[in-house]
UniProtKB/Swiss-Prot annotation:
Its EC number is 1.13.11.6. GO terms for molecular function: 3-hydroxyanthranilate 3,4-dioxygenase activity; ferrous iron binding. GO terms for biological process: anthranilate metabolic process; L-tryptophan catabolic process; NAD biosynthetic process; quinolinate biosynthetic process. Catalyzes the oxidative ring opening of 3-hydroxyanthranilate to 2-amino-3-carboxymuconate semialdehyde, which spontaneously cyclizes to quinolinate. InterPro entries: 3hydroanth_dOase, RmlC-like_jellyroll, RmlC_Cupin_sf. Binds 2 Fe(2+) ions per subunit. Pathway: Cofactor biosynthesis; NAD(+) biosynthesis; quinolinate from L-kynurenine: step 3/3. NCBIfam families: anthran_nbaC, PRK13264.1. SUPFAM superfamilies: RmlC-like cupins. Disulfide bonds: none annotated. The gene is nbaC. This is 3-hydroxyanthranilate 3,4-dioxygenase. O2 binds at R46. Fe cation 1 binds at H50, E56, H94.
Amino acid sequence: MARLSAFNFKAWIDEHRHLLKPPVGNKMVYEDADLMVTVVGGPNKRTDYHDDPVEEFFYQLEGDMVLKLYDGEEFYDVPIREGEIFLLPPHMRHSPQRPQEGSVGLVIEAKRPEGAADAIEWYCFNCGNLVHRAELMLTSIVDDLPPVYQAFYASEEARTCGSCGEVHPGKEPPEGWVTL
């Protein structure tokens, strides 16, 4: 067994900073660990909410972000400023928004228990009802998520609210949806 050692995390971030912006936006720190330790960069904007079966730990290293939450009754924002941390409970619908260029955050979550599904949900910007939910067995953020998003964006039927008939905009949120 190889000897274990620490490394300079700030230097690691600087070395991988080119990946922390669109279109990639994130980089796993450890590939073969029981924790998914991910560094995420801004800017990003998204319109989906994630239903994660495990807790997520957020530590905002550089710049600020907003975590949009839906608790089943109310939509609300939790700003996470540079230097702040936040622990998200399992199954709390959340939409991480990092509007600041060059912002960097650390997200830590456990690998999924056997058989535990993640879900991506989109809600109507007009009436707030669920428009579409896609469940998946998440093993790789990079490989597993893009097909889910592409399928939703490509289907007007999937993007049409069953309650009010409004068509979800897909990838682009309405102007002013994210404020710090």
